Amino acid sequence: VAKFGRQQITYRDAPFHRYIGNVLWRQNHQTFDAFSIQNTSLPDTRLSYAFVNKINTIFGDDRDAGIIRNGVIDVEAHLLNAQYSGLPFGKLEGYGYLLEYEDAEATSSKTLGVRLSGAPAINDAWNLVYTAEYARQSDYKSGTMDAQDYYLAELGAKHKGWMAKLSYEVQE
């Protein structure tokens, strides 16, 4: 499936779009002026790519702050995401987000990461719930940011409509 023009781009269900998403819990959703393509021809696999040149933020047309001009961020971004759900115990995801900001080149960054998540059945009533994710964010093109590592670890249980889990999330 290919799309061109203003669109919402998400690679995970809400609220789990940590880096790329539509900020759907706000009254105004974030959209992208982009070309995107998604391929699901391989079994249990979704391959996605998007080239974005504008991010239409949640703030509306009259917002100017930092890199936001009239509610828009000018960017040249390449978004790559691959997901494989054919594992018996969960879903594996790899991603690379390359962002070059036109009005703040020093903040241009690349984020490369991997995520494994699942909810395998323990028995007929209970599921084990887990997520493990690692990403590294560093400078890209004329960016000058220091590299940062992101870690997420979650473990919990799900019973019927209820779920409880412990999470550890840090970016350093």
Region roles according to the model:
Residues 2, 22-172:
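Signature for the C-terminal beta-barrel architecture of outer-membrane proteins
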Residues 15-19:
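Short Pro/Gly-enriched beta-strand edge/turn motifs at strand-loop
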